[in-house]
């Protein structure tokens, strides 16, 4: 794998935010998760670790495996899985988003 994986960023944040609506949450929450996903894709880290390109379908499939929760809950669950498997994904977790009250 080469270092050009950072140019892999074909993940469309608007498309992902719309796809995340199936998990509920607010528009702000879905947009925040989508931005974190784009940052992860742009970093090239996921592709380097897993050998797979981050796509809308892949993110939605992975988040569907979570036991439940909002898009941010599901995203943070998946980031936890990636952190356990590969280490160092904590920076991509969603801590706060507009309207989260935190």
Residue ranges and their predicted role:
Residues 1-102:
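Haloarchaeal acidic low-complexity proteome signature biased toward cell-envelope/secretome components but also
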